[in-house]
Amino acid sequence: MLWHYKISPHLSVITNSEPTMSNAVTAETANTNNTSIENAQYQPQLIEAAQQAKWATDKRFEVSNEPSDKPSRYMLSMFPYPSGKLHMGHVRNYTISDVLSRYYRLKGYEVMQPMGWDGFGLPAENAAIANQTPPAKWTFENIDSMRAQLKLLGLSIDWSREFATCSPEYYQWEQWLFLQLYKKGLVYKKLATVNWDPIDNTVLANEQVIDGKGWRSGAMVEKRDIPMYYFNITDYADELLDDLDQLEGHWPSEVITMQRNWIGRSSGMEVHFPYELAGESNSLDVFTTRPDTLMGVTYVAVAAEHPLAQYASEHNEAIAAFCALCKKGSVAEADLAKAEKVGIDTGLTVTHPLTGEEVPVWVANYVLMSYGSGAVMAVPAHDERDYEFATKYSLPIKQVIDIPARYFDDIEEGNDNRAYTERNTLVNSGEFDGMDFEQAFAAMLAKLEPQSLAKKKIQYRLRDWGVSRQRYWGCPIPMVNCEHCGTVPVEEQDLPVILPTDVVPDGRGNPLKNIPEFVNTTCPKCGNPAERETDTFDTFVESSWYYARFASPNDTTNMVNKSAANKWLPVDQYIGGVEHAVMHLLYARFFHKLMRDENLVSGDEPFANLMTQGMVLAGTFYRVNPDGSTTYYFTKDIDIDFNERGQPIKAILKSDGQPVTIGKIEKMSKSKNNGVDPQITIDKYGADTVRLYTLFTAPADQTLEWSDDALKGPYNFVKKVWRIASEHMQALTAANLSLDTLNNGTLNNDALNTEGLSKEAKALRRKTHETIGKIDSDLGKRLALNTPVSSLMELANELSNFKANSEQELQVQHEALIDLLIMLSVYAPHIGEHLLEQLGLDTVTLNYPAVDESALVQDMITMVIQVNGKMRGKMDVAPNSDPEALKAQARAIEGVAKFLTGEIKKEIVVPNKLVNIVVAG
């Protein structure tokens, strides 16, 4: 049976009550709620449940694709893999996006913040094997669980746009795009040497090979030749590289640099070394960025898969054995760079194109067949790798670049690497002696090109993207293999090719091969029996275009609706980890250009702005066992003593009362048992506190060191805000003041009576409007998410210390509280919106408060008085007072005058800040 799951109905986070407050909350209805600020203590669980139920009911975060008077804003965090449980990295990532989304809504934007699920992948397959359950069932159960957890965070997500990439409704469109690209020649199939993971039985991209091992299994990677489908990403290499210029200042510079290096455009010369083999003339073609060193070539090296190596293998068992050994290694450049350089002489030679001398051909493990022609010219005197190899095998080393005397002075004692790799004038190069790089390049090209022995060439480090994976849980590749017609694409009307979802894999290869009803089909071309392709797409294919599908997730006739895409794309702010710099982010840029060329989207880039958030770290606690192994313990199982700075100084295991070692602060991980369950933390402190903590503790783009003890700070702050609001509400009730009148004055600065305000009331208004302006700048211009929390805390302190002694001062206090709550609702939406509603405001229609410039004007300022640089007093004066008057006033102050016993040498006035009197002796 072939069947598939659809996303289940959205789980309601709140099941025990319906919201009791309408959207238009009045003073009367606010007081009837069981969480009234006049009658109850701060209870985050009740408040957050009520607000989440309200948001689910009124669907205020759903947005339309129809034209709007409001400007649009698309905020997106990289969507999660449905592992089943949120971790604190998720919490931080999605809180960042949500804070920005809520801020821009208050600023008058129509904000789309969607959520979906990166549903395909190896973890689901592994879990299915372990639990003997279909990956589809495991995946969609996890989606239901994680959706509920995300809703507990109070994220302002448009859930109507939700999808999972493992649903046919989604992946049919990447199958469709694959067919369009196949028609254009941008998809092709070839036999390729690949990284093969012998445990997971799949091909790995170079980026997925770490220290010669598979990134998931940890198995040593082998080389294997298999047929694979490729996306011709190199056709877009120039555009991918050049368009990075558009992203300067909008993306982190390190990500741009990583992509530039990964694409790796090199300008140089292709040189042909002629040879004869078995009576036939041919040439060994090599690419070099240093043709000025051509006269220093003393050997050439080829990959084990190169035709010359294969020829030599057929005639020499030792060479055959060496080539076989090379093929077992990784094909990732990073691994080859770290591996020991080894090789074997083939006994073959090629002719140097300039000197006519015979040059030996070696097979070397550091040469990749998949890069360039699979051959390199070796210049040991001027290349570190070649020098290492030549020294090891006693090959000639010929200097052809002049080496400055200072170079030898800089060489550290005991450093055997004497290759000089800089550019300089040529020596020992015959007619090219004395030339610099450019001159030698031109002269050699002029001599060799007419003989068809060289040509200018641009080469890329980037290689075409192999997307075939020998896994079950992925999107089927829509191709058919026919005995008569060969490889044939599936007809568009037969899409999607649906993946069977009732399969329980056993870990031995791809189970699709063993499902006759999936494999057996008819050839679209000749109608004869044929077999479906059983490879599935690399899961990076799904994540390369999901951002665009969010614009029109329910469109059944288009991959992306052009009108919707024009409204929402590009993504205004994308948020995710820097570890995706050269995989997901590069592939998404590539796919955007592919979709643009299919007239599905406009513009050249998918993400206008990128933020790479820092990792969440936590302390580790462990014991070293007698056998040398290490056991790590969860913090919940440890009693920890902290010093005054919040650092752990003593840790005791609860179960036996014995000490454990306090380890390093490291990235949260299962292996170190130092992860923190967001659910437990939310249950204890509430989601608002967790949100505040994750953004207040460190800048969003830097690492966050988690501390359970430090959560008390944001929690106490939220409780303080609750107390301030409660006391203010009681004062309003006692004064019999109308909330409608107060709110009108707060939301309309012109309606606020500011005549004759006390000094304290003016100071509170000034602090309020300074905070409004600062947070607006921090979020809207600087993308600084931690400093606004500090500003809110400072404003709350001012409010807490302010005592209103009149109706006018109660109005000032009300204004400050309302503005505080509006800004707080960006970070802590549950308490912020709840208190605003209790105070009679409709949170759906609220805007970010406007700065009242008149409130920033100071009637009096406090200036510091110094004598010889030491503070001796203060004085309140009018701003921009006359400097001479300030000097006289400062000298006259009793606390200052006693320090002026000597001759006054100098008086310095720093306008509106200080007066410094310099006295002799």
UniProtKB/Swiss-Prot annotation:
Q: Where is this motif: 'KMSKS' region?
A: 667-671
PROSITE patterns in the record, alphabetically? AA_TRNA_LIGASE_I
Q: Where in the cell is it found?
A: Cytoplasm
- Report motif location: 'HIGH' region: 80-90
EC number(s): the record gives 6.1.1.4
Gene Ontology CC: cytosol
Kindly report the protein's main subcellular placement as a broad class: cytoplasm
What is a GO molecular function of this protein? Answer: aminoacyl-tRNA deacylase activity
- Repeat among keywords: no
Which of this chain's residues are annotated to bind ATP?
A: 670
**This protein's UniProt keywords:** Aminoacyl-tRNA synthetase, ATP-binding, Cytoplasm, Ligase, Nucleotide-binding, Protein biosynthesis
GO biological process assignments: leucyl-tRNA aminoacylation
**Is Ligase one of the keywords UniProt gives this record?**
yes
The highest taxon in the source lineage is Bacteria
Q: Which reaction does it catalyse?
A: tRNA(Leu) + L-leucine + ATP = L-leucyl-tRNA(Leu) + AMP + diphosphate
Signal peptide residues are none
- Cite the Pfam families for this sequence: Anticodon_1 (PF08264), tRNA-synt_1 (PF00133), tRNA-synt_1_2 (PF13603), tRNA-synt_1g (PF09334)
Q: What family is this protein classified in?
A: Belongs to the class-I aminoacyl-tRNA synthetase family.
The protein's name is Leucine--tRNA ligase
Native organism is Psychrobacter arcticus (strain DSM 17307 / VKM B-2377 / 273-4)
